[in-house]
């Protein structure tokens, strides 16, 4: 699992270091890479950025949308070597995934050795808990997929309220620690 705190092709299609690193972790010469943009409400520009970067790399890119006519996701996920989850609203993303049983399919993919990765909400989702801004009023801790039995806080160094919020959550024993 590669959890990315922020950045990547969602911010800029010109810096592909993270994307190349992800591909280097796979032993296959031309892996299948699936982008799941659920957290961004399947933002079209985000998906275009994914293809702008990954279609130029040595891989077979594809994406899954849930808010249109949804394909047989099991047949797609089962063929993927790398699954990249985009950023956005973690709470909404996980609710959609659970409705479609994607959470179970991702666990099967993880257990068979697929590389799971993502940025922001796509980083949080793999952990037991994540500190998220899915609620507009404040940061909250939420239960996630629990593939990694820890807590994750993306943007810890990049957003001014993250660090003090994490420290308060630890101090008040809301969480034990945070990665």
Question: How should these model regions be labeled?
Answer:
Residues 1-7, 149-158, 179:
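Glycine-rich anion-binding loop/nest that anchors nucleotide
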Residues 1-86:
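N-terminal beta1-alpha1 cap of cysteine-dependent amidohydrolase-like domains
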Residues 7, 87-91, 122:
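Short glycine-rich anion-binding loops that position phosphate/pyrophosphate groups of nucleotides
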Residues 14-15, 46-47, 98, 162-165:
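Residues at alpha-helix caps and immediate loop-helix transition turns in enzyme cores, especially N-
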Residues 26-27, 75-77, 108-109, 144-146, ...:
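Solvent-exposed alpha-helices and their adjacent loops that cap or buttress functional pockets
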Residues 58, 79-80, 113, 148-149, ...:
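Short, well-ordered alpha-helix to beta-strand connector turns
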Residues 92-96, 100-163:
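Class I SAM-dependent methyltransferase SAM-binding "motif I" and its flanking Rossmann-like core
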Residues 165-179:
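A conserved acidic, glycine/proline-rich C-terminal tail/linker
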């Amino acid at each position: 699992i590669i959890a990315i705190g922020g950045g990547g092709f969602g911010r800029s299609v010109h810096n592909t270091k993270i994307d190349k690193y992800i591909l280097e972790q796979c032993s296959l010469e031309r892996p299948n890479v699936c982008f799941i943009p659920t957290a961004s409400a399947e933002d079209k520009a985000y998906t275009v950025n994914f293809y702008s970067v990954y279609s130029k790399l040595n891989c077979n890119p594809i994406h899954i949308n849930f808010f249109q006519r949804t394909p047989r996701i099991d047949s797609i996920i089962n063929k993927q070597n790398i699954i990249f989850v985009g950023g956005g609203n973690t709470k909404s993303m996980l609710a959609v995934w659970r409705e479609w049983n994607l959470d179970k399919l991702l666990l099967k993919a993880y257990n068979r050795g697929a590389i799971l990765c993502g940025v922001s909400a796509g980083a949080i989702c793999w952990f037991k808990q994540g500190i998220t801004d899915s609620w507009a009023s404040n940061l909250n801790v939420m239960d996630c997929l629990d593939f990694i039995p820890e807590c994750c806080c993306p943007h810890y160094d990049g957003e001014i309220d993250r660090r003090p919020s994490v420290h308060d959550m630890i101090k008040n024993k809301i969480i034990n620690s945070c990665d």
